[in-house]
């Protein structure tokens, strides 16, 4: 036999449980906060409303009042207006005038005058004086005597005081569209001419050409090239002055000039010609300034070490500079030499002139030995008839080793010897290894040389 399951009975509501268990203190833990609106959600709304303003929307745990403005009813019944009824003015009664009544109606009725019993004042018939009036056609003439008063003034002329001359200008006359104004120049007092003088103190002898004041030049803005944000790099390559793009990329024939800002786009990793210009994407225009007594050529470069997805480059700033030349404190005095040579230094010689007796004649010995220096000698003159040729040798000239040249000489055993010509015509014997031929002899055509020998008969 199957057992039937017991029917589940519905639990009482929270309000019913709160009414029975509140006094006994046996209420479950969730009944009292729910009925008294003290749950976690109610506390969040209570404390959150203190710091959050909802603009008067009435959002909260309180009663719905519609905010500050309140609720507006959908349908409003206006109160009926009470109509105003004008009040009637009472009629004015007008008395009628009978035909027999007088035409002048007294405004004050006699019956309205009340006599208080005081005595009535009656004006007297005769006053204290009489006024007599008469009419006459004769005009009244008054006898008025004229009194004359004489005033005398004395004028003394002061020679130390001179009255200013008053010049009256003539009225303007218009003739042919032009206004002509003439002024009289006649004066009764002498005119003193005062020459104008300048009050400008000038250190130079020349006076200024104009009186316009020189505007004060303001302080020039200082270029911040030596701050901590810039890395200082000195460039020694001379190409930095004329064509700095050669230090970063290859030479561009469409280059505009060095006075503009240079931009460089590097799509791939590359190595510049100069390692100091690595990752340079922008090179600003040059600036020339003085730094510690030297002229300095400067440019500011921008590195593109990193770049974001949006394409913006991020990198430091570098100050590239190169010192051109020093600035001298004072002008240097350079001695000028004459351009025209004097008579002593002239290279023209008179071949017919007599030799100078003061000049000592010393024979010059020429030695062609290896590594033999020439000694300094005085100027010597070798007489050949009437011709005098001065010979001047430099000081301490070393002769490089070369070939030894031997000239043939005639025998002196006989009393008679043939005449030897001035130039050697015999064969030349060259002994040595360190010598160089003249360049034209390398490609010269070899020809057979005939050496003419001089013979003489010898008497027995």
From Swiss-Prot:
GO terms for biological process: microtubule-dependent intracellular transport of viral material towards nucleus; symbiont entry into host cell; viral penetration into host nucleus. InterPro entries: Late_L2. Highly phosphorylated. It is found in: Virion; Host nucleus; Host early endosome; Host Golgi apparatus. One of its GO terms (cellular component) is host cell Golgi apparatus. The keyword Disulfide bond applies. A motif (Nuclear localization signal) lies at residues 1-12, 443-451. Keywords: Capsid protein, Cytoplasmic inwards viral transport, Disulfide bond, DNA-binding, Host endosome, Host Golgi apparatus, Host nucleus, Host-virus interaction, Late protein, Microtubular inwards viral transport, Phosphoprotein, Viral penetration into host nucleus, Virion, Virus entry into host cell. Disulfide bonds join 21-27. Pfam families: Late_protein_L2 (PF00513). GO terms for molecular function: DNA binding; structural molecule activity. Its main location: virion. The keyword Nucleotidyltransferase does not apply. Belongs to the papillomaviridae L2 protein family. Minor protein of the capsid that localizes along the inner surface of the virion, within the central cavities beneath the L1 pentamers. Plays a role in capsid stabilization through interaction with the major capsid protein L1. Once the virion enters the host cell, L2 escorts the genomic DNA into the nucleus by promoting escape from the endosomal compartments and traffic through the host Golgi network. Interacts with major capsid protein L1. Interacts with E2; this interaction inhibits E2 transcriptional activity but not the DNA replication function E2. Interacts with host GADD45GIP1. Interacts with host HSPA8; this interaction is required for L2 nuclear translocation. Interacts with host importins KPNB2 and KPNB3. Forms a complex with importin alpha2-beta1 heterodimers via interaction with the importin alpha2 adapter. Interacts with host DYNLT1; this interaction is essential for virus intracellular transport during entry. This is Minor capsid protein L2. The gene is L2.
């Amino acid at each position: 036999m199957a057992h039937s399951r017991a029917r589940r009975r519905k639990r009482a509501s929270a309000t019913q449980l709160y009414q029975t268990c509140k006094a006994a203190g046996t209420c479950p833990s969730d009944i009292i906060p729910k009925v008294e609106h003290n749950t976690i959600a109610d506390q969040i709304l209570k404390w959150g409303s203190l710091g959050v303003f909802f603009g008067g929307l009435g959002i909260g745990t309180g009663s719905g009042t519609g905010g500050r403005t309140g609720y507006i009813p959908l349908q409003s019944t206006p109160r009926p207006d009470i109509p105003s009824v004008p009040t009637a003015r009472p009629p004015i009664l007008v008395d009628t005038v009978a035909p027999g009544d007088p035409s002048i109606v007294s405004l004050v009725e006699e019956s309205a005058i009340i006599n208080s019993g005081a005595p009535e004042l009656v004006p007297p018939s005769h006053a204290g004086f009489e006024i007599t009036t008469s009419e006459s056609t004769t005009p009244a003439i008054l006898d008025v005597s004229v009194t004359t008063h004489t005033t005398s003034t004395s004028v003394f002329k002061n020679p130390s005081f001179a009255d200013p001359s008053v010049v009256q200008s003539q009225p303007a006359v218009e003739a042919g569209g032009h206004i002509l104004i003439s002024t009289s120049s006649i004066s009764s007092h002498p005119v003193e001419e005062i020459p104008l003088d300048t009050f400008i103190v000038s250190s130079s002898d020349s006076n200024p050409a104009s009186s316009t004041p020189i505007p004060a030049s303001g302080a020039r803005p200082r270029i911040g090239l030596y701050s901590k944000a810039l890395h200082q790099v000195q460039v020694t390559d001379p190409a930095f002055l004329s064509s700095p793009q050669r230090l970063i990329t290859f030479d561009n024939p469409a280059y505009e000039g060095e006075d503009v800002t240079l931009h460089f786009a590097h799509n791939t990793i590359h190595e510049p010609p100069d390692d100091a210009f690595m990752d340079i994407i922008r090179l600003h225009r040059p600036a020339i300034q003085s730094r510690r007594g030297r002229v300095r050529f400067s440019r500011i470069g921008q590195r593109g070490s990193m770049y974001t997805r949006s394409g913006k480059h991020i990198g430091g700033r570098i100050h590239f500079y190169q010192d051109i030349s020093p600035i001298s404190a004072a002008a240097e005095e350079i001695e000028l030499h004459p351009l025209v040579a004097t008579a002593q230094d002239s290279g023209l010689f008179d071949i017919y002139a007599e030799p100078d007796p003061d000049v000592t004649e010393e024979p010059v010995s020429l030695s062609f030995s290896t590594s033999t220096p020439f000694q300094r000698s005085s100027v010597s003159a070798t007489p050949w008839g009437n011709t005098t040729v001065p010979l001047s040798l430099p000081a301490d000239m070393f002769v490089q080793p070369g070939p030894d040249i031997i000239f043939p000489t005639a025998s002196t055993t006989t009393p008679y010897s043939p005449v030897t010509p001035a130039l050697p015509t015999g064969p030349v014997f060259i002994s040595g290894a360190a010598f160089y031929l003249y360049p034209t002899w390398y490609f010269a055509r070899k020809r057979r040389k005939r050496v003419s020998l001089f013979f003489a008969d010898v008497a027995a």
